Design a protein with these regions (language model features):
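Helix-to-loop junction immediately C-terminal to a conserved catalytic motif
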Residues: 61
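ABC nucleotide-binding domain "signature" region
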Residues: 104-116, 232
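Conserved ABC ATPase signature
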Residues: 125-129, 133-135
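Hydrophobic anchor residue at the start of the ABC signature
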Residues: 139
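A short, proline-enriched helix->beta-strand linker immediately N-terminal to the Walker B motif
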Residues: 144-148
């Protein structure tokens, strides 16, 4: 894939995508997508199931070589998937340092594991970890590489609601400290609004929405403007909020 034109090359930590397209047979999944993410910006990509969100992220991660268009990414990038893909026969600390060498690697691994709340799990085996703990290892494995760009593909999709809340708080704290550019793929509108500086919606292979999120932080669902933005985004995803309401009991109360 050719690089982006020199006039559009980003500074460190950013991403520039120009006219990216991808087809599978007759089906067009990405249709001329263009996007720039500056250093430090947290961008969330929404879309219906099968909209091409993960296909786009795989292209940016250089995991799909049949994409047309130009993609220029930061030299240091890291990817976190829904399945952290830990090596089962390596202890936690060795999963974090996988593929790295140097005198300070072990020290740095201990530091990042401490940052994600796993300072006492250095010698643990992956099979002993909960889903949330395994995903924390995935984040630590990304952090130790000191990435300028972090790509996350529905990383919390398989976690329970309480663990997701904790992971949201952790991810926001880590982003505030390290300030990489972030592209976070999800189908969860509430998650997008809670985390994003900017929200994109992929529809029919194109970006139908590109909106800055101006809500004050920290955000909760009662933050002024949250519900308005939620309704707007759900509409773009083809969801009527009325469809999400709980059915009423016979006496008229919600169940």
């Amino acid at each position: 894939m050719p690089p982006a034109p020199d006039g559009h090359r980003p500074g460190p930590g950013s991403l520039v995508v120009g006219g990216v397209s991808r087809s599978f047979g007759e089906r067009v999944v990405l249709d001329g997508v263009s996007l720039t993410i500056p250093h430090g910006q947290f961008v969330v990509l929404l879309g219906r199931s099968g909209s091409g969100k993960s296909t786009f992220l795989r292209a940016v991660a250089d995991l799909d070589h049949d994409v047309e268009g130009s993609i220029h990414v930061a030299a240091r990038r890291a990817v976190v998937f829904q399945d952290p893909r830990l090596v089962p026969w390596k202890r936690v600390i060795h999963n974090v340092t996988l593929g790295l060498a140097g005198r300070d690697v072990k020290r740095r691994a201990r530091e990042v594991l401490e940052e994600v709340g796993l300072g006492d799990h250095l010698r643990a085996w992956p099979a002993t970890l909960s889903g949330g703990e395994a995903q924390r290892v995935g984040l630590a494995r990304a952090l130790i590489r000191e990435p300028d760009l972090v790509l996350l593909d529905e990383p919390f999709g398989a976690l329970d609601a309480l663990t997701r809340i904790k992971m949201h708080a952790l991810l926001q704290a880590l982003h505030l400290k390290y300030r990489p550019a972030v592209l976070f793929v999800t189908h969860d509108v509430d998650e997008a609004i809670l985390l994003a500086d900017r929200i994109l919606v992929l529809e029919d292979g194109r970006l139908a929405v590109d909106e800055e999120v101006g809500l004050a932080r920290p955000r909760i669902r009662t933050t002024p403007g949250f519900q308005r933005l939620r309704t707007e985004l759900l509409g773009h995803l083809g969801v009527d909020e009325g469809e999400l309401a709980e059915p009423a009991e016979p006496d008229g109360r919600a169940g």
